[in-house]
Amino acid sequence: MKFTLSWLKQFLDTSASVTEIAESLTAIGLEVEEIIDKAADLQKFEVAYIVSTKPHPSADKLKICEVETKNGNLQIVCGASNARAGIKVVLANIGVEIPNGKFKIKESNIRGEKSCGMLCSEEELFLASESEGIIELPEDAVVGEPFTKYYGLDDPVFVINVTPNRGDALSVYGIARDLSAKGIGTLKELEIPAVKSTFSSKVKLNIKDKEACPLFTFREIRNLKNKPSPDWLQKLLKNIGVKPISSIVDVTNYMSYSFGQPMHAYDADKIGGGIVVDRHCEENVIPRLDCGISGEESVIQDPVVKPRDDNRGFHALNDKKYLLNKSDLVIKDENGVQALAGIIGGISSSCDSNTMNILLEAACFNAKMVAASGRRLQIDTDSRYRFERNIDRNFTEKALNIATDLILSICDGGEVSEILISGEKEPAKKTLDFPAGYLEKITGIKLTILLHNEANKGEFVGNTEHSIAAYKEVREDASTGLTPKLPLEASYVKGLNIKGIEAILNKLGFATDTEKDVIKITPPSWRHDINILEDVVEEITRIYGYDKIESIKLPELEQDNNRLREHKRISSFKRILASKGYDEVVTNSFMNSKDAKLFTELKDELFLLNPISVEDNYMRPTIVPNLLDIVRKNLARSIKDMAFFEVGPNFIGLNTEATYLTAILTGSYNSKNPHSIGRSYDIFDLKSDLETVFDYAGLSIEKCIVSNQATPLYYHPTRSVNLALGKNLLGHFGQIHPKILKHYDIKEEVFAFELNITNLPAPKAKFGKRDEFIISDYQANFRDYAFIIARDQPVGEIISYINNFNKKLVKSVILFDIYSGDKLPSGKKSIAIRVGLQADDRTLNEDDLNSFSKDLIANIEQKFQGTLRE
């Protein structure tokens, strides 16, 4: 939206500076994108006077002009057809840069004649897209002064960004109203002229689609002199980039920018029959309308059917042709379509310099239809821009009277008909009950309460922090005497009072009526975006000033160290597994109950009452089935080597869940190559990765209780274990049961671990802190032991025991063989273990090693009934 300072002052009595106006506009939500001051940009171009001209001796189209300037007369060669003696023109002296082309004027020789400057056109100064000659200035222009003063360029142009909900701000009058409410001047009272009709129009009006066109008004004006519009009007339009055409067209453009009401003028002599507003039809069925006094109902006689000519289309004012369809709303007569409603007029009924009689239209069209047609046909006009943001239907008839009065005054009078109207005005807006305390509730702006003291007729100042309830009690007790506690001038410092709220809303056009502590608010007809109390709060706040809202420090949130610690730990686990080659996935927390039944006993409380789909009707008891489903999909795409993990909740019961780190592994550890036969992943690869996670958490699998009793049924019964720390179950790891894999159509071995992060103990030291790593300078020694133990004895317990047997000496324990066969007693197995021994303070001698072996063998025999194999 563009407008000039002088245009604004037509409706706003203000002495505010350009800067103050711009700051206020931005503060009330009408962001100023740019202020164009062409006077500053073109101040070096001055007024000059052509004393005489003579033909150029070597060029027919050039003239040699003697030009009077402030520094004396100059000779300038000019090719403009309108260059002649006796006119004031715009001069660019030597050294001045021309905007269009960015070149500097130099003294030159043109076809043998000296030229000491340049006489400028509008096009060369970027004042118009094209021009036919040099600029001619008024006769009273003073030679040597900047030409901008006489061309109307000393009028700054505001360019503002209007949000889609503020169609009322697409008018200078609407902007003036907002600035007046902000306190930047006083809104001038708008005088609506009373235009008396001198004849009755015989043009009939028929609105076929009331929803598409809720209001259509027009009047006929005869015997006009369609001369160029006056300088003041041309300057306003030129400054905002609108090309002046003629008095009639310029007035319609002026009305659109001044009041936000698009208008259109038809050459009445080019209109046949009557006016019909309807959706475009496949075959142009144009009714021949009878003549007579217009009314709501029109008599349609003898329809004239004209076949549609797709090659011709609708010829618009932009000299382009458009093919219309049934969704387009058109204005037509018996000759065909004369305008695309709300968007653009047709060239066949356009006004020109010979136009004397017009039909002047002011209407309201459906915003969605206008927007849809404009988008489809790719036509952008000021009219469309306003209609698709809704206009004030209650102002349409007033706008028609203002425009009529302007046209009559500019075109030296004429004859006017009565206004022909079809449709209704905007119905009254819904009244909103606005509680006095609602403003503070939403924005924090404290409401100042003014109480009358009957004793001294003064005012008591209170705030909502003293509560409106207290105010009610005081007001209802007529006998209460109040002494002012704050000076009277402080009453408007801390906040608004109810009267202040009403004043703001009234200046914005809202009707208000206060009953006790509730303001009954009726939005004006031009505010289509005011529907709820929050909309009213926004209006009050933007005018009152966002900068006046008191800054309140947010309360400091207490940091939950446990949650923070868990979050850091989870992040570390993710990085560890990612470094091991795992990919993180995030899957749905819901699953099919049929699949869930394979993994756990179903619980009624975990069924979803309103599932997204029948396939996802159960809360997952474990993440494993989701990961298996990913494995199945990848195998179907010939991707065989996979390592995935996910951190997420497992749902145990109603309001009971635990966060699990779940990983799955399948495929080859390394593929076959010239240097290796390759091998597949096994359970020990998974165990190694789990040990790394445990190690970073400050734990050790060796310290856990390892048991293969009661592992989940979806694990292989003899190739899986539970991990516990005391009574806390930390998780499971092992090979997935073949029956489960068969259900998922997976033929490869799959290994998984599940770690219950919720049950992991907090590390005693700072998370991630390692003990100092010390390398002994003394000789390491290794001893191999073969023990015969019970077949069902877990080997891990023995390894864990040896690791903790003598921490000062034992550096490593490695299982390198397990044997069970006929050479051993029934129910027995043999294990071979290599123990690494090293002291930090000395070299171990034979006595030290023998003593260690003797004690270890004795303790293994006592604790595990294991005997040393000979």
UniProtKB/Swiss-Prot annotation:
<keyword id="KW-0479">Metal-binding</keyword>
<dbReference type="GO" id="GO:0006432">
    <property type="term" value="P:phenylalanyl-tRNA aminoacylation"/>
</dbReference>
<feature type="domain" description="FDX-ACB">
    <location>
        <begin position="776"/>
        <end position="869"/>
    </location>
</feature>
<feature type="binding site">
    <location>
        <position position="535"/>
    </location>
    <ligand>
        <name>Mg(2+)</name>
    </ligand>
</feature>
<comment type="similarity">
    <text>Belongs to the phenylalanyl-tRNA synthetase beta subunit family. Type 1 subfamily.</text>
</comment>
<dbReference type="InterPro" id="IPR005121">
    <property type="entry name" value="Fdx_antiC-bd"/>
</dbReference>
<keyword id="KW-0648">Protein biosynthesis</keyword>
<feature type="binding site">
    <location>
        <position position="539"/>
    </location>
    <ligand>
        <name>Mg(2+)</name>
    </ligand>
</feature>
<dbReference type="InterPro" id="IPR036690">
    <property type="entry name" value="Fdx_antiC-bd_sf"/>
</dbReference>
<dbReference type="Pfam" id="PF03484">
    <property type="entry name" value="B5"/>
</dbReference>
<keyword id="KW-0963">Cytoplasm</keyword>
<dbReference type="Pfam" id="PF17759">
    <property type="entry name" value="tRNA_synthFbeta"/>
</dbReference>
<dbReference type="InterPro" id="IPR004532">
    <property type="entry name" value="Phe-tRNA-ligase_IIc_bsu_bact"/>
</dbReference>
<dbReference type="InterPro" id="IPR002547">
    <property type="entry name" value="tRNA-bd_dom"/>
</dbReference>
<dbReference type="Pfam" id="PF03483">
    <property type="entry name" value="B3_4"/>
</dbReference>
<keyword id="KW-0820">tRNA-binding</keyword>
<dbReference type="InterPro" id="IPR009061">
    <property type="entry name" value="DNA-bd_dom_put_sf"/>
</dbReference>
<dbReference type="Pfam" id="PF03147">
    <property type="entry name" value="FDX-ACB"/>
</dbReference>
<dbReference type="GO" id="GO:0005524">
    <property type="term" value="F:ATP binding"/>
</dbReference>
<dbReference type="InterPro" id="IPR045060">
    <property type="entry name" value="Phe-tRNA-ligase_IIc_bsu"/>
</dbReference>
<feature type="domain" description="tRNA-binding">
    <location>
        <begin position="39"/>
        <end position="148"/>
    </location>
</feature>
<dbReference type="InterPro" id="IPR045864">
    <property type="entry name" value="aa-tRNA-synth_II/BPL/LPL"/>
</dbReference>
<dbReference type="GO" id="GO:0000287">
    <property type="term" value="F:magnesium ion binding"/>
</dbReference>
<dbReference type="InterPro" id="IPR005147">
    <property type="entry name" value="tRNA_synthase_B5-dom"/>
</dbReference>
<dbReference type="InterPro" id="IPR005728">
    <property type="entry name" value="RPE1"/>
</dbReference>
<dbReference type="GO" id="GO:0000049">
    <property type="term" value="F:tRNA binding"/>
</dbReference>
<keyword id="KW-0547">Nucleotide-binding</keyword>
<dbReference type="InterPro" id="IPR033714">
    <property type="entry name" value="tRNA_bind_bactPheRS"/>
</dbReference>
<keyword id="KW-0030">Aminoacyl-tRNA synthetase</keyword>
<dbReference type="Pfam" id="PF01588">
    <property type="entry name" value="tRNA_bind"/>
</dbReference>
<dbReference type="InterPro" id="IPR012340">
    <property type="entry name" value="NA-bd_OB-fold"/>
</dbReference>
<dbReference type="InterPro" id="IPR005146">
    <property type="entry name" value="B3/B4_tRNA-bd"/>
</dbReference>
<feature type="domain" description="RPE1 insert">
    <location>
        <begin position="450"/>
        <end position="498"/>
    </location>
</feature>
<dbReference type="GO" id="GO:0004826">
    <property type="term" value="F:phenylalanine-tRNA ligase activity"/>
</dbReference>
<keyword id="KW-0436">Ligase</keyword>
<feature type="domain" description="B5">
    <location>
        <begin position="427"/>
        <end position="551"/>
    </location>
</feature>
<comment type="subunit">
    <text>Tetramer of two alpha and two beta subunits.</text>
</comment>
<feature type="binding site">
    <location>
        <position position="529"/>
    </location>
    <ligand>
        <name>Mg(2+)</name>
    </ligand>
</feature>
<dbReference type="GO" id="GO:0009328">
    <property type="term" value="C:phenylalanine-tRNA ligase complex"/>
</dbReference>
<dbReference type="InterPro" id="IPR041616">
    <property type="entry name" value="PheRS_beta_core"/>
</dbReference>
<protein>
    <recommendedName>
        <fullName>Phenylalanine--tRNA ligase beta subunit</fullName>
        <ecNumber>6.1.1.20</ecNumber>
    </recommendedName>
</protein>
<dbReference type="InterPro" id="IPR020825">
    <property type="entry name" value="Phe-tRNA_synthase-like_B3/B4"/>
</dbReference>
